[in-house]
Amino acid sequence: MAMDGFETRQRTRWRTPEPEAGALRHPTLAEIRHVPGKRGLPLIGVMPEVILDPLAFSDRMVAKHGPVYRFHALGKWHLHFVGAEANERILFDEHGIFSAEAGWGPLIAPLFPGALLVKDGAEHRSRRRLLGEAFKQAELSGYQRIFARDIERRVESWQGRTIDPYVEARALTFHIAASTFLGVPLEEEAHVAIHSFAAMMGGLLTLVSNPKLSLVRRRGFAGKARLEKILSRLIEEKRASPGSDFLSRIALLEDEDGLLPVQAIADSFIFLLSAAHDTMASAITSLTYYLASHPGWAAAMREELAAAGIDDFREAATATLPLLDMFYKETLRLNNPAPVIWRRAVKDFSIHGLDIPAGTMTGCNLMMTHRLDGLWHDPLRFDPLRFTPEAESRRSRFAYVPFGAGVHKCLGMHFSQQQSKMFLAHLLLHAELECRDRRPPSWYHWPNCRPRRSLSVAVRPRCRGK
């Protein structure tokens, strides 16, 4: 959305380049018939199966076709790749074969044209370097103070109740979005901003991409427009009187031409907000459920905190706590917030003896790699001891990549890890959790991992010294 009064120089900086016409074309069936797979229904392909249960669909495809398979969806052929070798080849991308812009662009670019995820090459490096300034440890410490306050207030409201972790996690991340990221109180404008954001995300995920044909898509664009308007004003206010919130830090970023254009900041910030909001809600839900379901691990982690002399959960953010780290890693292995990472091949390549043509949509299926027999013993069992130093040394480092890998590795990885450790430590120090579900939950793995049905966790205050 262009903004009135912008100088020409501001409008052109960080501009999203138009793709070259005909630079890439999607492969025909004849070109990839040698890759095993499935066409599905006319036009929509396998989308009904994928939407019904993404994990079950992937599990069937891997069982029948192996670690590389094709499927037809919405008029195009796509390939999924499973395994550590594919993660290394595609995500690390040593030879520059894969484009994140062309892979994620069709899904993300209509609503997030300025997102870091849909940039490649020099433009990506420049943006990542600038935005990385907001993720340095000194900055993270400022965000943590705000985040800690939100955790204390929200988790205190859980005490003595039986909660649905996903509902509560969404409420918590609502507060975090307003305070840690936007730096505004939870008043009317914050509610408008976050509900606009929710409408925007709904518009992103609808299968009908044309706003003229989809009410959900129109609401998405309208929500983004409202959010941009609010952000534009907030950015100017933050520049005049910055705080310790995330938006204040980004608003003050400069390149060789000075302060970044407001629109460029808004574009980048909106996507960072969306990624943090959804992935954090997913992680907090899963951490709460698994903590309630594994009291033995809860006791062991409490002993670890006591041995480290930690009685303030804030200290856990940067402390060396191997058991907490292993618990967190195992949670993300089973319930990865980003189940699939998309790229598109810009050159021909070969993998597992298969020749793949340029133009192919290539997805690294992390949810299946993280459950792959051979990489993981008894892969569906929750077992944080998979992540002892000895166990990790026997595995490829690309077997576990919850935040991606290579130049597009999640910029907020350390932020997410530190917030999750603080959250875990607060629950361990201040609450006793008990899972009340009679059967294991079913998880839905798109676009982020979340439970299919309500979960039930009883929370009661913990007697200190217990």
Language-model segments: what does each one mean?
Residues 279-298, 302-304, 414-429:
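Cytochrome P450 catalytic-core helices
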